[in-house]
Swiss-Prot record:
Keywords tagged on the record: Amino-acid biosynthesis, Aromatic amino acid biosynthesis, NADP, Oxidoreductase
Protein name: Shikimate dehydrogenase (NADP(+))
Active-site positions on this chain: K71
Subunit annotation: Homodimer.
Reaction(s) catalysed by this chain's protein: shikimate + NADP(+) = 3-dehydroshikimate + NADPH + H(+)
Upper classification of the organism: Bacteria, Bacillati, Bacillota, Bacilli, Lactobacillales
Amino acid sequence: MKIDGHTRLAAVIAKPIKHSISPFIHNMAYDLTDTNAVYLAFEVDRENLEQAVENIRLHQMLGANISMPYKQEVITYLDELDESALLIGAVNTVVNQNDRLIGYNTDGLGFFRSLSNFHIKGKNLTILGAGGAASAIIGQAMLDGVEKVCVFDLRDRLAGHQERMGQMSQRLGHPIQLLAVEDLAALSDAVNQSDLFINATGLGMDGKSLPIPSDFTFPKGLLVADMTYCPAETPFLRLAREQGLQTVNGLGMLLYQAEKAFELMTGKKMPSEEIKKALIEKLEI
């Protein structure tokens, strides 16, 4: 990597973010594509978010990725939203186009690209969690023609999600069922009617926690996914695998959302398969 007077800067903005693998992905992509840029991780407090976003313009950065907990809040500070970000109501990529900050959402595209040989059109989806990344997956599923969407979260969080999910449902013209994960009968019923079941809660990152009971029974033929990539197999995925189901972790989503963000910021195609091999080696997956 060379650093000179022409080097451009990009970053990921979030809190916490020191654990992020995004700098590894983007800096490797810059090296492989001979792009004179460097990608850093910025851990930003909420009261400094507006200034951090304005710095993208001030320092003529290529752009920035936005992670939790700022995917909705960042919208206030942008000049324009792409259609997917507008429909979903969350942004994970900001691109500096001639001093105009444009927000995109590549999370949903990245997730569904990671599901090889699976297409959501006409199928049913059940998802645990309703945060920014979950919203992106739900929104992309509706754009891609999903038949039925059931979202489960803790009962005391439902009121906080109601307005945002309602707005997304209205914008996309598709109903969303928002239910309490404590209602095990409703959860079991929804999963039994589903083709895809996703854990988007973050539970399982510790290698121990489960978002569902340990005696939960999955229906045959269900595809089970977890947005977590470390550990490579969460307890949620292990439970599904032990019942003979196909499982997918979050590594592909991480890579392919970055691929689209890289393309938006640089205009170049990311050498994704080479980077994927390096990621697997780095994470010892």
